[in-house]
Amino acid sequence: MKTEKEIHQHRKDEHLSLAYKYWREEKNQTSGLTFSDSRIIPNSLPELSTKKINFSSEVFGQNFEFPFYIEAMTGGTERADKINAQLAEIAKNQHLAMAVGSQSIALKFPELAAGFSEVRKIHSSGFLFANIGAGHSLENAKRAVDMIEANALEIHVNTAQELPMDEGDREFYWLENINEIASQLEVPVVVKEVGFGISQKTFKALAKTSVSGINIGGAGGTNFAWIERKRSKNGFNLDEFGLSTLESLLEAKMADNRKSLIATGGITSAQEIFKSLILGADLSSSAGFILKNLMQTGPEKVEEVIEQWKQDLNKLFVLTGSKNIEECRKVELLYSINMLNFIQQRK
């Protein structure tokens, strides 16, 4: 009979395998709005040079020279730790921030903390996000941060992942706990969705807390409800549930969000990063797309993709006459009829 630790580790490895399968089979489609529902209005006289572009973003007291980071994926098993080490090496080489996957397993079984700590050893001077669930205590939040000497903490809110999970939580009283952690922790706290987007109601609730940032984790990226349905026997289907990344960005605008904003959920190109910036994001991040490329082609190819994104983003800034992110925010987008309908309904 498997021990509790072995069961937890098996679940971690199942998540990895199913996330890879999800992206390999291109199941990351959403019934909601996508970035193709908006088009960038060009500036034919940009009066700019590619050498004069500065797309760095000042967030959480840190200058991110490229407004993108490697999002939380995994950790806590031999396979997962190897992937985290590869991601940390990529992040170091590309001067990117990185988030580790949920550290719950290492908080419960401290002997597994070394795999997470290795990320800091590799990316010694990089910006790292620790990661815990919203039900964890302030003490566990501090332990997670200390484990990787993190610069910030992601608290994931994952109701739509827990409910399809046979062994998942069934009680979700999180808001007060999140605020306690955010108000007492010494590093910035980011609340992160895990693939279902964030509504105006949630933005407004978080506005009253001490959290520093919100990661919208919209539909269109890895769908953890799909992953848990594959693991489960209950067949609870949430394929059509939630808000897409683009819809969540619009919700943030309509909620007059003032927290730092991170666009995650199916980010696969520089153009999607650029549109996210136009719509108010301070940073973008990606997990599943990076994982798929890492497992299919290896770390060198992932670095090539990121290098290409940097070049492409530079060109998009020039094409719109934007020297920096402040000017990028003024770029006009042409909205599709579906996008206009969404805005009208949600006003």
Swiss-Prot record:
Amino-acid positions noted as binding Mg(2+) in the UniProt annotation, renumbered to this chain: E162
Localization: Cytoplasm
Enzyme superclass (EC): isomerase
UniProt KW Magnesium keyword: yes
HAMAP family linked: Idi_2
Family to which the UniProt record says this protein belongs: Belongs to the IPP isomerase type 2 family.
Protein name: Isopentenyl-diphosphate delta-isomerase
